[in-house]
């Protein structure tokens, strides 16, 4: 890798699941600074302090705390408000008239609203999170001082909000995090802060990109778009999963060779798929390649929104399975459904622009009309 030295890269779906489910692979050496994260970009230091770099049993305790507030049951209850807000965004787009930047006007705004509701962030403060999240994930194009200043703003803001929720609890995730701190002295304020910020960073930036890529995928596949329009409610769930699996290819990016999931280090010699990963060696999963493994997926090169067997690993697997997966899936389903329900004639008006200086390489501009 350009950074952090050599790393084993797993492309086969079954081997990826085997490794991700094996507790002998850990991330502590990256968190402590003993090892540099082997990656295609210089991995942001802040992210190495977050939950995804913790290992059990501490990781398990922290994760359970947040999972209670992002349970499938709670996310299901949030769906109606997501649908309502998606339609408000579409109303605003229609009122302004085409062309529109689908990313700014729709795909980013929807997950920001939903995550802010979950965390209990006041409406007037929500636009700040777009700047803060992009800064956290920036790997070029911004100076270290600019990134540090934005991170400090975010940390100060969230610390203040957590303190408010401890004093005046509400029915939101920050209140639950603050209450947990009061009941459990082993959970520090810094841990609460990093969990909240990780949800902000991962909870809307990635989801916004999934929504954008999903819409673009349907715009580029006439047969799949027509099929989706014929049964939006019936196909929303499987369409969302296919976007998670196949969206990278629809962007014109290679099936393999992406950055992959966050790497692990083997604590002892471990055999995976006939290969021995030696103690101390790093290994990562390329989820795009694993999602196009012909041994796991039939006709993997084809976009099929009716696909039932879809064992993609875009949201990872095992103890590090994406914490916000229920919320991300719901937002992606709603984001795809409502835009095509309201604007069935949606069409692209230019190439998608991608920010290659960001860890997640998000689409920043997708001009559309209807």
Residue ranges and their predicted role:
Residues 1-370:
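Cytochrome P450
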């Amino acid at each position: 890798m350009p950074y952090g030295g050599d790393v084993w890269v797993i492309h086969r779906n079954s081997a990826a699941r085997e490794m991700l489910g094996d507790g002998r692979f850990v991330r502590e050496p990256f968190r402590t600074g003993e090892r540099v994260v082997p990656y295609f970009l210089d991995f942001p230091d802040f992210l190495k302090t977050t939950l995804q770099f913790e290992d059990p049993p501490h990781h398990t305790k922290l994760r359970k705390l947040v999972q209670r507030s992002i349970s499938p049951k709670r996310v299901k209850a949030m769906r109606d408000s997501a649908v309502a807000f998606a339609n408000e965004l579409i109303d605003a787009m229609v009122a302004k008239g085409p062309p529109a930047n689908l990313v700014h006007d729709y795909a980013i705004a929807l997950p920001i609203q939903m995550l802010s509701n979950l965390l209990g962030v006041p409406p007037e403060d929500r636009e700040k999170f777009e700047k803060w999240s992009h800064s956290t994930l920036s790997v070029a194009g911004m100076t270290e001082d600019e990134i540090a200043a934005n991170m400090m703003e975010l940390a100060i803001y969230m610390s203040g909000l957590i303190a408010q929720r401890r004093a005046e609890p509400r029915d939101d995730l920050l209140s639950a995090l603050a209450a947990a701190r009061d009941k459990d002295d082993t959970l520090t304020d810094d841990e609460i802060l990093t969990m909240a910020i990780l949800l902000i960073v991962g909870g809307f930036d990635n989801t916004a990109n999934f929504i954008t890529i999903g819409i673009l995928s349907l715009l580029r596949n006439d047969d799949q778009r027509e099929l989706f329009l014929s049964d939006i409610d019936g196909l929303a769930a499987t369409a969302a999963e296919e976007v998670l699996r196949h969206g990278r290819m629809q962007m014109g990016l290679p099936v393999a060779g992406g950055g992959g999931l966050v790497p692990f280090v083997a604590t002892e010699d471990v055999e995976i798929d006939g290969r021995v990963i030696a103690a101390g060696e790093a290994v990562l999963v390329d989820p795009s390649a694993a999602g196009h493994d012909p041994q796991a997926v039939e006709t993997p090169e084809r976009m099929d929104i009716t696909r039932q067997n879809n064992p993609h690993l875009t949201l990872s697997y095992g103890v590090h399975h994406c914490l916000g997966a229920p919320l991300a899936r719901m937002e992606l389903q709603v984001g795809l459904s409502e835009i095509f329900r309201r604007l069935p004639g949606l069409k692209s008006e230019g190439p998608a622009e991608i920010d290659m200086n960001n860890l997640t390489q998000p689409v920043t501009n997708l001009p559309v009309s209807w």
